[in-house]
Amino acid sequence: MVNYPHNPIRQKVTPLQKQQKHRQVDFANRGMSFEAAINATNAYYLAKGIAVIHKKPTPIQIVKVDYPRRSRAKIVEAYFKQASTTDYSGIYKGHYIDFEAKETRQKTAMPMKNFHAHQIEHMAAVLKQKGICFVLLHFATLKETYYLPAKALIDFYQIDRGNKSMPLDYIRKNGFEVKLGAFPQVPYLDIIEQKFLGGDYN
């Protein structure tokens, strides 16, 4: 069969292909939480030899332990303790990285009740030692994620000791939007390179 220029064969596009073409890349579309997406991002950085950043284990308080056997101990009652520092830490190009991650379904502000005084103190201590410290803030309803330097968070917290929510306008003015992707899903190192180190990790 000869296909003349005035009558080209049109390739059929299935509804699924149309959906995949126009759908925004978002970890939520894969049924992932914000935390899981960050963990996957860190695993990507580690596998590629880019950075070594891990989630800190949540501390627990053991209340009751049973000993069914002399050589075995079984925890039967425990509860999570309030974290004294931040969620993640590690190293990238010789720089100490330390950050917290928060998510909200609100559209106009990030609740400051999500941050505790000892976490703010920890971030200030990291900055004093010249570490790179920040928070990743995800607005689930808006599908927007921001990198906010720790100094901007600390400055806002000190206004009224964290009793009011942080407006999205403040975050946009003092932070940087993280464009979500596939590999990695939450490419926050892009912000560190572009805004603070002036290079490119690729």
From Swiss-Prot:
GO molecular function: endonuclease activity; magnesium ion binding; nucleic acid binding
Annotated function: Endonuclease that resolves Holliday junction intermediates in genetic recombination. Cleaves mobile four-strand junctions by introducing symmetrical nicks in paired strands. Promotes annealing of linear ssDNA with homologous dsDNA. Required for DNA repair, homologous recombination and chromosome segregation.
Source species: Streptococcus equi subsp. zooepidemicus (strain MGCS10565)
Binding note for cofactor: Binds 1 Mg(2+) ion per subunit.
NCBIfam families: PRK02234.1-1 (NF002580), PRK02234.1-5 (NF002584), recU (TIGR00648)
GO annotation (BP), single: DNA recombination
Annotated binding of Mg(2+), by residue: 85, 87, 100, 119
Cofactors named for this entry: Mg(2+)
Protein name: Holliday junction resolvase RecU
Site-annotated residues for Transition state stabilizer: 102
Cross-referenced CDD domains: RecU-like (cd22354)
Gene3D superfamilies for this protein: 3.40.1350.10
Chief location bin: cytoplasm
Catalytic activity: Endonucleolytic cleavage at a junction such as a reciprocal single-stranded crossover between two homologous DNA duplexes (Holliday junction)
Gene Ontology CC terms: cytoplasm
SUPFAM superfamilies xrefs: Restriction endonuclease-like
Family note: Belongs to the RecU family.
Location relative to the cell: Cytoplasm
Keywords of this entry: Cytoplasm, DNA damage, DNA recombination, DNA repair, Endonuclease, Hydrolase, Magnesium, Metal-binding, Nuclease
Entry superkingdom: Bacteria
E.C. no: 3.1.21.10
Xref: Pfam families: RecU (PF03838)
